[in-house]
Amino acid sequence: MLKVSVITACFNSEKTIEDTILSVLNQTYKNIEYIIIDGASTDSTLEIIQKYRDKIACAISEKDKGIYDAMNKGIKRSSGDIIALLNSDDFYKDEFVVEKVVHEFENKNCDSVYADLVFVKPDCLEKVVRYYESGEFNPKTLLYGVVPAHPTLFVKKAIHERYGLYKTDYKISADFEMIIRLFVVQKISFSYLKEVLVIMRTGGVSARGFKSLLLRNKENLRACQENGIQANVFSMLLKYPRKVMGLFKRGSKGSLKRND
């Protein structure tokens, strides 16, 4: 029975962390190792984590060098066959997510599994703001924004051991760099589940204003260049029409039902 290590990196996440924790603990798949890496929160995040401490395999709180450093700490401490990263603004759509993913790993014998996600407003978690369709990955459509949604990505730990962890000198695009490194350069095998597995609140680390937009494009360009992909500032803009389409697609998906 495959063990899945779910890692949550958090910092001052008192408003959202409980949804994240419960979405993991309520999974029907039971061979889950849950790891929480906190960046020395000063709000009530640690008190909330403590409520569920007996069901969490590992929970540490210490200063770190950012979210990607926290992710790396979690991966290093994990003992699972499969790694999943679920940030403290996000939560699984339902209790069957991990079970479905493990089933896909077993059936397809692949290195990774990913799916779609939806964005919701922090004050209205049932209302879809944008639908992100990951699509079947193809290096040719990379610059058009057709990449696996990182929060939905499950990867065998052996892949990280072979090809490395997240680059901590990136501020908000180390996830994009990781996807390029694994899917384009190393050509790992994958299976795409055409359904929503993760719900993400708007306003996360990588979605805070115009400065973040500029930084993300700059780091995305750097990630392409470091991995031998030809790209420029203009090619980085090709993904935005697809993002706009995601705004329209939300209407066809309706509202979400929550189980709490």
What kind of feature is each model-predicted range?
Residues 195, 208-234:
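Catalytic core of nucleotide-sugar-dependent glycosyltransferases
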Residues 47, 51, 103, 222, ...:
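Charged/polar, solvent-exposed surface patches and flexible loops
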Residues 199, 216, 240-241:
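Short secondary-structure capping/turn micro-motifs that flank functional sites
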Residues 1-212, 252:
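Nucleotide-sugar donor-binding/catalytic module of glycosyltransferases
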Residues 225-260:
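Membrane-proximal basic amphipathic "stem/tether" segments
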